[in-house]
Amino acid sequence: MKIIIFGLGKIYRDNAHLLPSQDEIVAYMDNNKELYGQCIDGVKVVSPMDIAVYEYDKVVIMSSYANEIRQQLLQLGVSEGRIVYGLQYIYERKIYDMPQAIVPEKRKKILIATSNLGYHGGAMVCIFLANALLEEGYSVTIAAPIGDAAFIKEYSQKGIQLEVLEGLPYAKFENIGWILKFDIVIANTYPMILLALEISERVRTVLWLHESKNVYSEMSFWRSDIEQKLLKTKLKIYAVSEMARDNFCGEVGYRKEQVTIFEYGIPSVLDGQADRNGTVTFAVVGTIYPLKQQKLFTDAVELLNKRQQNDNRFWIIGKIADQEYAKKILKQIENKPYIQYLGEKSQKELSALYDNIDVIVVCSKQESLPIVVVEAFMRGKTCIVCDNTGISKYITDKVNGYLYKTNDIGELAAAMQYFLDNKNVIAEMGKNAREVYEEHFSLEKFKMRLRKEIDWLEDNL
């Protein structure tokens, strides 16, 4: 096959070695004019404007701006069928070995396919789901295209079968025939929708949505294809919150009544309370990148008076995903000992820290159902939460949590000020938050919902 590679940035550099060796690259293209005329393995880098002079079967896009480049190619006269995303092109031809976990046994088998294994909400929900299914007597495997080594080691040692299958979101059914050995496949998170649609005609498949709007822009390259396949799929779709449902339906034109709200549940752990002599500890927990808006937190802390800053603690906890964004935050908190970045923590390490946390703060631009808030409620901790989150419907302001206007630094500072001025309400609001957990997010309630839905799937799909 003759192909043109469009895009020579990080995605190309990280994946060029995976391109099929039998394919002939006839040209490289990029929108960076400084690259024109250079050669890669004897093949020239040229302007996209020159595409008409080449004979090719496919244009393989190796860029995070895939949708924009597709539109550019369409305007240049390239047909839709000749445009393909690079990772999809690489992995849809890969033959996947059968996971080691699939062994002959009487128990029913469930595969949870997710986008990434690590110490973050989507993966932790998979762990909680897997444990609930194991307790119900199912054999469970979790598979993802990438994974954090420490996370995989920790939960493998706890008896959960974890598999890393590179390129899994783009796999073709003929290359994963072993998937028929599973009774149900749960595609966890929207980035797994291509796999879900690929297999849904042959195996009971559900899609469980958690996403905020930004994820849909990242998947916009496939929007038209997804919309068409959804019209005739047997796929059963769930969402963890009304916001997650509405984001999906607004993106692909799906009817809301066809999506079932299915909240997750987490196991119960009650923390102790350390004696801190009146010190209040506020914490933001989550991956460090712009969507989570940790800088909103640090900016709001700056609005408090010096005594309130120095007499209390303000923690940032999470893995750095955006180095430039993190540098701004770390620079800002230099020589400010009251604001600390504690780094990424395992679930065990985070549990130990919770004894010393009084109030969890959520600053995100949007969150469908942030697991950090559910975990805080489970632990009897109150939260400050922006109003543009799926969890806000469960919060009664100043009863079990505090709601503030999204992106409003002044309102966030006022929320922290409220707890500093009214320290006596923290424990009572935490107790009320625990009641929300018990009513909606306990593992017992989750397993009840799970049994009901699995029974429905087995009877109707």
Where are these regions (language model features)?
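Short alpha-helical donor nucleotide-sugar binding micro-motif in glycosyltransferases
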Residues: 344-345, 352-357
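A short, well-ordered alpha-helix in the C-terminal region of glycosyltransferases
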Residues: 411, 418, 425-440, 446-452
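Short, structured helix-loop element that forms part of the nucleotide-activated donor/catalytic region
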Residues: 149-156, 244-247, 313-338, 349
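Short hydrophobic beta-strand element within catalytic cores of glycosyltransferases
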Residues: 382-385
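Aromatic "clamp/platform" in nucleotide-sugar-dependent glycosyltransferases that forms part
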Residues: 365
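Conserved acidic donor-binding segment of nucleotide-sugar-dependent glycosyltransferases
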Residues: 397-398, 402-409, 418-423
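A conserved mid-protein helix/loop that constitutes part of the nucleotide-sugar donor-binding site
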Residues: 120-128, 289-303, 410
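A short, active-site helix/loop in glycosyltransferases that binds the activated sugar's phosphate group
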Residues: 232-258
